[in-house]
Amino acid sequence: MPTINQLIASPRVIQKSRKKVPALQQSPQKRGVCTRVYTTTPKKPNSALRKVAKVRLTNGFEVIGYIPGEGHNLQEHSVVMIRGGRVKDLPGVRYHILRGVLDTQGVKNRKQRRSKYGAKRPK
């Protein structure tokens, strides 16, 4: 417990909580351009080739975004929209790329949870 004199010399500092998605800067989504589209492998118990893209955002940040769903049409210079949301088994991936927005096409033949993958209603 500090003394009164110690508190006068150096007052208590309020600890700031760490932001989970700093690149969004309080926005719900941000637009960006893909600089690299590639696959990477997940952490230990899991095994796969996860599709990710390095994205340069309009505010200058460079982030890694996960491409959800089966199959995608992204390549370098594709314009994409990102949202927050990490991928637990991919270290450093703290954003998701939105499907069916801007240059990203929706997932083909998707019947359930279509809104999450930008898929139109089947006829």
From Swiss-Prot:
3-methylthioaspartic acid modifications at: 89
Keywords attached to this entry: Methylation, Ribonucleoprotein, Ribosomal protein, RNA-binding, rRNA-binding, tRNA-binding
Gene3D superfamilies per record: Nucleic acid-binding proteins
GO biological process: translation
Entry-linked CDD domains: Ribosomal_S12
Disulphides: none
Name by which UniProt lists this protein: Small ribosomal subunit protein uS12
Organism: Nitrobacter hamburgensis (strain DSM 10229 / NCIMB 13809 / X14)
